[in-house]
Structure formats: structure tokens, C-alpha cells
Amino acid sequence: MAALALLGFALSACGGGDTSDVPAAEEPAAEEPAAEAPTGDPIKLMTVTTLNANGPTYENIAITANLAAEYINDQGGINGRPVEVIVCDEQFDPAIAATCARDAVAEGVVSVVGSFTYFAESIVPVIAESDITWFGACCPISPSELTSPHSFNIGNQPMYAVGEVKRAVEDGCEAINAVIVEGADAIFRGPMENAMTAYGKEFGDVIITPTIAQDYSAEVARATTGADCMVVVMSETPFLTWNTALQQSGSDIKQYGNQGNLNAISAKGAEQVTDGNIISGMYPDISTEPWDEYRMMLEKNNVDQVANDFNSLGGMGTWAAYMGFYQIASGIEGDLTAASFFEAASNTSSLDLGGMVPVLDFTTEWTDGLPGYARLFNRSVVYSQLSNGQVIPVTNDFFDVSDLAMGIAPE
């Protein structure tokens, strides 16, 4: 079986809470009573992602899924029952992704939560037959994720790429080139070009880069020709190679990139050329208030936040997904099953995650928007930037880019 079940997961045997000393002259502060430990049959959830593959992997998703389960169980579980997470590694193989789907059905999971895979088309139709939802995805890229009634996306992909165009134009960029990693152009290029049209512009060039490359010098040379800015959609690993080539090129072109990929890891060694780069994303920076509990869990478990980026689509997206599931599931009276959760999610008109994303309405599809994107409920972006190789927030305000994605000029 490609899935690994983890219950009550802790990343470090020596992880702990606050150990600061209390002055002897003071009475210790009264602690809030601990929540009663959950009991009974576990509520099984699955998270699907890539952990072992020759290409991008997403350990931050698996780690966060288990941290979220631990957090929920620390609060007493869901209506008194513990949460059990099954992490399924699809190994960047559609056949194994299909096995994950069958395992979800066989294990009786209530929902597949906070997942990212390039092969959701091998999963969503299979689990939907058993009323199992595909809940809270950050980054939908397959038709089923964007159209199936059993898909409840919390992230906004591909809208952050539209946000890159918006910010580049508003920053005064005159000549803009686009760089999109191979395989992503099918869902990103159209909305990005629509946004350019809305501003009365068009890309000077659109460069499609290979997913895996040892050197992007040729592509960088093309992207920096005849442009003062470029908007880039790329995963973290190729972005590292890209930024290295950009630094070596000596170009001073301004770059706009996507959250969780244009980051401290991919900017390492290229701090000079990436300084001031703008990051368009789905979620406010991890340093902000909506993520207080997430940061607490990372610190409590002594998670290595250098090896993996948790200020990212995978990290924050998975946490938001689990908190969304927690909120909806906690309000269900009676048995919590795949079918009852599907019904509850379908009737949720105001999912408020405290600023992680805008308040979401799962009862209203985007039927008057881009064809094929009906289940994209979040269409707003938020911005950060790179400063000396570190990501810092620009604003916590969300900007709706629905109209730009359809080529409608801003008023």
C-alpha cells in the first residue's frame, strides 16, 4: 500500500511547549484546562502528495497534514473523536495516484484533504463515486479539481499568476515577458494573457521552460531580451536553477513570481538579482496572525523550517484545508461520514478561516467566469516580496482578480 497512516504524529521526541522560567516571587499563571482527549473510532482523512520522485517533492504537505491532525486532537478532536491522517505518496506516478484513490475508498476516509498532485484526474472521479470529497486543495490543475461537485478548493491557482500581471502593470512595467514551466501553461497562460489584454497589452514573449533542467541560461537570455519585467510561474526546484542563471546573466530585470516557489530557498545564492522581487500568492505571509497556531505547532515539534518551506502554498495551503475541514465537520450533527461531510460542505456559504483566505462561499460556483473553472471559489491574491533573500509581507489585503482573468479592464 502506498499510504502510511500516522495518528498522534510528533516530529521530534524532544519537542515540547514553553519552558521559560517563572519568577519565584510570582504565582504561576493559571493554565486553561486541557481539552478532553478524543476517544472512539478515528475520523480517517487522507492527504495525497509527492514524497519520493525524481522531481519536485512536497514533504511540507505531509508534515503539515500530520501537524494539523495533532492540533485538532489536542483540541479534543472533532465532536470528541480523534482524527487519523493517511499520507499517500503517489511518487509522481498516475497509476500510484489511482491506487491512493482506491485506498481512500477501502479505508473509508471521510475526505481527501489539503492535497497536491499532478494526477488528481486519477483520483477525484474515483473517490467521488463514494461521496468522498477532494477538500481544500491549494493548487487545482486538473479538470476534475476545477469542475467536480466533490471538489472544494480553498486556494486560488491559477489566479496568483494573474496577480503577477496585475502588480507588474501597476508597478509601471512597460515590456513584459512571461515564463511558464512546461505542463502549467494549459491552465496559466490563458488567464495571464487575458489580464494583459485587460490592460491593453500583450506579452513580448512567452517562454515555456522544461520541468527539470541543469541550466536555464538559454531561457533566461530569451526572457530578459526586450523586457523590463517578467512574470514567472515555476516550481521551487526549477526556480532555484532559474535564479542561479538569472544571477549569472547580470540582468537587472524585475521579476514577479509565485508564492512558495519564488522564496528564500530558490533565491539562495541569487540574493542580489532577486532583491525586491514581488511574490503573488494565495495566503498572507506565515509571520502574520492567521497562522499563529500553525507556527506554534511547527515550533512545538521542532520542525526544520530551513529544509522545507512552510511559508508556501503546500504548507499554508494544507493547514488552511485542515482548519476548513475541522470547522465544517465540527458543525455536523449525527454521524460524520463522507456523505454527510459532502452535504455540509456543499451547504457552506461562509467559511471564515480568520484571514488565511477571504471568506468563501461553497454554495455558489463561478459559472459566469472562466469556462472550466467553476469550482474556483477563491480568486483573490496577496503580495509579499524578497528582501536580501528573505520573504517579507507587503500587505495582508486580498485583491480580487476575477475580472482580470476574464480580460475585463479594471474600473
Regions found by a protein language model. Give the residues of each.
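C-terminal motif of bacterial Sec signal peptides marking the signal peptidase cleavage site
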Residues: 10-13
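Extracellular/periplasmic periplasmic-binding protein-like sensory domains
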Residues: 246-320, 398, 402
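Beta-alpha junction/loop-to-helix N-cap segments that form part of ligand/metal-binding clefts
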Residues: 15-19, 56-63, 75-145, 154, ...
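Segments of small-molecule ligand-sensing domains
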Residues: 303-312, 327-393
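Periplasmic-binding protein-like
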Residues: 47, 104-117, 135-137, 177-180, ...
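Low-complexity, Pro/Thr/Ser/Glu-rich flexible segments characteristic
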Residues: 18-40
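Extracellular/periplasmic Venus flytrap/periplasmic-binding protein
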Residues: 143, 147-250, 288-289
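Extracytoplasmic "Venus flytrap"
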Residues: 35-66, 90-94, 116-117, 181-187, ...
